[in-house]
Amino acid sequence: MLGKYKAVLALLLLIILVPLTLLMTLGLWVPTLAGIWLPLGTRIALDESPRITRKGLIIPDLRYLVGDCQLAHITNASLSHPSRWLLNVGTVELDSACLAKLPQTEQSPAAPKTLAQWQAMLPNTWINIDKLIFSPWQEWQGKLSLALTSDIQQLRYQGEKVKFQGQLKGQQLTVSELDVVAFENQPPVKLVGEFAMPLVPDGLPVSGHATATLNLPQEPSLVDAELDWQENSGQLIVLARDNGDPLLDLPWQITRQQLTVSDGRWSWPYAGFPLSGRLGVKVDNWQAGLENALVSGRLSVLTQGQAGKGNAVLNFGPGKLSMDNSQLPLQLTGEAKQADLILYARLPAQLSGSLSDPTLTFEPGALLRSKGRVIDSLDIDEIRWPLAGVKVTQRGVDGRLQAILQAHENELGDFVLHMDGLANDFLPDAGRWQWRYWGKGSFTPMNATWDVAGKGEWHDSTITLTDLSTGFDQLQYGTMTVEKPRLILDKPIVWVRDAQHPSFSGALSLDAGQTLFTGGSVLPPSTLKFSVDGRDPTYFLFKGDLHAGEIGPVRVNGRWDGIRLRGNAWWPKQSLTVFQPLVPPDWKMNLRDGELYAQVAFSAAPEQGFRAGGHGVLKGGSAWMPDNQVNGVDFVLPFRFADGAWHLGTRGPVTLRIAEVINLVTAKNITADLQGRYPWTEEEPLLLTDVSVDVLGGNVLMKQLRMPQHDPALLRLNNLSSSELVSAVNPKQFAMSGAFSGALPLWLNNEKWIVKDGWLANSGPMTLRLDKDTADAVVKDNMTAGSAINWLRYMEISRSSTKINLDNLGLLTMQANITGTSRVDGKSGTVNLNYHHEENIFTLWRSLRFGDNLQAWLEQNARLPGNDCPQGKECEEKQ
């Protein structure tokens, strides 16, 4: 009896312990048991054992593998049955690359075949997946919700880039919402439609109708798409609402063996470059899956520009597109034309690799060429891009990159540029691209040839220009010739394109030989050195200095912010004598003394143009020439330049002070002030004021000259010495003494006059003495005038009055009335001399033969006064 109790107790313990043991070891035996029903070569793995709670079955982690490839990874799954089956899953990750590794198995005869049979097997179930991830398309992840019954199956998917809501009732599929964000910063593509599914779910819907609305990037108009099909054929039409011609028209047919798009048409009228063409695609054996389908087709592109029409054709296939190893040959041939530019292409290539990471390899003979006109004045004779061996992947471009450019500009000249480099998985800010470049050309306007050469690389986010040398054999413009100017790198230019710590730095040097001027001036060899330091080429600081021999250095610094250039320039104080090489030797001018310094602030921007302001100062300047000297020159130039106009004298007038000018006559204490706008306007005139010169024992004054001029500027002559004037001119025919004054109304923009109604008059007694030889010669040559000439051998002038007019052609008109007393051989007589003279002053100024002209006039116009006064008496002239 005791043995029976023991047996019963052992059986009870076995009944209790075996289920508990199985439950505690689910992670060990469930994968093995499930492998009986899984496809051959696949398995499941549990990193944590499932557990059963009051709420249901919890599976913390489950992986489904095809060989060593993880097809699915499920975490935080729970299965319960409140009113129907409820499956909640935290995350499901699917790797599309593993689908190609699933083994091919024959369908079981007992398996359901029709859609209705499959639907009848569905239990009443809710399935919620918080995060469904498709690799390698992680950006399309979202939340999936399913509500399943045998009558209706509902699906809802919510992601950042895609939203879907639809239901399947029998064979009728209704899509009530499909929103896809196809382009960044653009509204989503929206689609709704109804479809009839086939009786056996082994193909596409047997009929359907769908409409979609989308926005094209950078285009304001909406686009409508409509898809219709019935049985084995259909059509997709895409229309822009503001354009009657379809953007896409694809009629298609499908059979169990082949999918065909025949005579498809497309057009793209946007971006100022209209495109259109035809499309044909054939997919054989499509039902066998992507791995076994054979794809081929043809895409034509028609372009039109000022150079005519262009046609290019892309042929692809036959080949396959595979999730593992695609093999699809491609070839693009033909030409494209836009405006005056023509692009020629012959690009054989091979598309290989997986669809998740494809590789496009250009084959031998791949060449891209172009010619035509890019801008109005630049003609591209030919540009060539050999592409053989170049590979393009998601990681970037790999291979040798070359370019050869031949071009000319009708006025500037022609040039040839070469570029050769090696790319290694290069994309902007990723990978590496090393290059070198060289070239040469002509610069016709300055009768020069130039060359350029350099090296650099783009490695990840860093662009480095390691070598640069470019220059001209000469620059010849007008009267100037610059010998061998050349720009080189003193320090590599490095641009770090890092979002957190960007930088841009480098240093350059512009060196030139002598600058020669046809007049004989020579600027010594010059050097401009400058450096940049900043964030990127649109925001940096710069500084530098310019010097030529002993001239300079002129120091410059500033900044560029991508819109506005700001800076300052300083010319330190230095002797005026350093500019001696700039003085032509023919001038025989010797710069003896003086100091010069200047300071300028400047800015430049597209809207405001170039602006500058500052001042320049010359102190104690002195220059000597064989015939004259200029000493004590002080010049102060405050200025501002904006909107194409100079504003002179911003905080005070432009001032000129010259201590003395020694020439035929000596001028001292020369002063002048200038203030205003140039070019001048009525609202902002230009004023020349306080002009004063001490000369000929008196002075010349002008209070104000206003431009634009409405009134003449009055040039006053005060007590000028006629004897000093005659001594300076040094005529041999006569001599004068005494002072004279006058006023000359000066016009600069009058239609006719330079001086109108000017006058001269004696300020006191004056004397006129004719040279004896001159008087004797006149008497000898003209007996009639001889007696009158004798009265002018010596004359004391008591009153003189001269009216002066000068027109803008240079014609000087003088009308003089002179009254005086002649004293000859102890006799005296009153002389009344009326003098009228016309001569082109420009010609007279060139000849400077005033004395000879006066002698000729005296011969023709001298006359005896009336002899009504007894001999030996002083008589007054009758009025």
Swiss-Prot record:
UniProt keyword Iron present? no
Which spans are transmembrane here?
A: 7-29
Q: Where is it localised?
A: Cell inner membrane
This protein's GO cellular component annotations are: plasma membrane
Asked if the Swiss-Prot or TrEMBL record annotates the protein with the keyword Nucleotide-binding, the reply is no
Membrane topology for this entry?
A: Single-pass membrane protein
The protein's UniProt keywords, in alphabetical order, are: Cell inner membrane, Cell membrane, Lipid transport, Membrane, Transmembrane, Transmembrane helix, Transport
Disrupted gene: phenotype observed: The single mutant does not exhibit growth defects and does not show outer membrane permeability defects. Deletion of tamB, ydbH and yhdP is lethal.
Task: Tell me the domain of life.
Answer: Bacteria
Q: Which residues lie on this side of the membrane: Cytoplasmic?
A: 1-6
Q: Membrane side Periplasmic: which residues?
A: 30-879
Quaternary form?
Answer: Interacts with the outer membrane lipoprotein YnbE.
Q: What does this protein do?
A: Involved in outer membrane lipid homeostasis. Interacts with the outer membrane lipoprotein YnbE to form a functional protein bridge connecting the inner and outer membranes of the cell. Likely transports phospholipids between the inner membrane and the outer membrane. It would provide a bridge-like structure that protects phospholipids as they travel across the periplasm.
- The protein in question is named Probable phospholipid transport protein YdbH
Its source organism is: Escherichia coli (strain K12)
Traced from the root, the source organism's taxonomic lineage reads: Bacteria, Pseudomonadati, Pseudomonadota, Gammaproteobacteria, Enterobacterales
